[in-house]
């Protein structure tokens, strides 16, 4: 069906048509779209109009263009979350009606770096508990997690088999996470982490660096969470003052 009968800007009609085709299953997730020549002919528009529509669709994360390969339908995120709301990864997975799981990679007690010492206000000689693991949703790896906790707030013997670090802290130290200061960093393919998360080469990662504070405004947890950008989408509610 040609789009020429519509009086709106042609590129807007093309955008709507491609979105409808994806919604109706004509093009499926990760499927390659026809070439620009074929698609422009099918839609009855110029290649310049089609390129403008594809540019906007890429900005909206509807499609992804791979140089020298083609244009593909972007996979939909499984998880949508307001970043102003502090939830554990476990809670986010459960809210998506999926089953959370954990692949433990390593744990150790180590001496803090200079940044860690400043972050946690540690005295000389105080150590950190370091935990590295992968969080899964229905068995699929989606988040690579690195967590650091001061040893002086943990008992001599404790279990880190709990799915949630928030639960671990509350049960073992009495610390209730109240808020976190978060830095967000988009990164590309990571040689170590991306293969563990079973990412395609073009799949980006979203890194959240978070210092968590308890009910007494004390820093008790520092986490590095690498989210698959094709599975997670975060949004922020901004208010005018």
Curated annotation (Swiss-Prot):
> What protein name is recorded for this chain?
Uncharacterized HTH-type transcriptional regulator YmfC
The record ties this protein, via PANTHER family, to: GNTR-FAMILY TRANSCRIPTIONAL REGULATOR (PTHR44846:SF17), MANNOSYL-D-GLYCERATE TRANSPORT/METABOLISM SYSTEM REPRESSOR MNGR-RELATED (PTHR44846)
Pfam families per record: GntR (PF00392), UTRA (PF07702)
The organism's taxonomy opens as: Bacteria, Bacillati, Bacillota, Bacilli, Bacillales
Residue ranges forming the DNA-binding region read 36-55
Single GO term (MF): DNA-binding transcription factor activity
User: Signal sequence: where?
Assistant: none
Identify the keywords attached in UniProt to this record, alphabetized: DNA-binding, Transcription, Transcription regulation
Residue ranges constituting the HTH gntR-type domain according to the UniProt record:
8-76
Annotated CDD domains:
WHTH_GntR
- InterPro entries per the record? Bact_HTH_transcr_reg, Chorismate_lyase_/UTRA_dom_sf, Tscrpt_reg_HTH_GntR, UTRA, WH-like_DNA-bd_sf, WH_DNA-bd_sf
Question: What are the GO BP annotations of this UniProt entry?
Answer: negative regulation of DNA-templated transcription
């Amino acid at each position: 069906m040609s789009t020429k009968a519509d009086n709106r800007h042609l590129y807007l009609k093309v955008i709507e048509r491609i979105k409808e085709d994806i919604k109706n299953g004509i093009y499926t997730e990760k499927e390659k779209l026809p070439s620009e020549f074929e698609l422009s002919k099918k839609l009855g528009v110029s290649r310049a109009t089609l390129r403008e529509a594809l540019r906007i669709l890429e900005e909206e994360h509807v499609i992804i263009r791979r140089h020298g390969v083609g244009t593909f339908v972007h996979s939909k995120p499984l998880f949508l979350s307001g970043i102003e709301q502090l939830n554990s990864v476990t809670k986010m997975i459960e809210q998506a009606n999926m089953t959370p799981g954990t692949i433990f990679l390593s744990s150790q007690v180590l001496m803090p770096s200079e940044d860690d010492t400043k972050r946690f206000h540690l005295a000389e000689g105080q150590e950190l508990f370091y935990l590295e693991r992968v969080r899964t949703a229905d068995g699929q790896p989606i988040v690579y997690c690195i967590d650091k906790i001061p040893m002086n707030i943990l008992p001599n013997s404790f279990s880190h088999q709990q799915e949630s670090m928030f639960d671990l802290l509350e049960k073992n130290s009495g610390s209730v996470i109240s808020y976190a200061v978060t830095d967000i960093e988009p990164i590309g393919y990571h040689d170590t982490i991306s293969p563990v998360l079973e990412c395609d080469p073009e799949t980006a990662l979203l890194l959240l660096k978070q210092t968590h504070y308890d009910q007494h405004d004390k820093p008790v947890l520092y986490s590095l969470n690498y989210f698959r950008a094709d599975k997670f989408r975060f949004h922020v509610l901004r208010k005018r003052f």
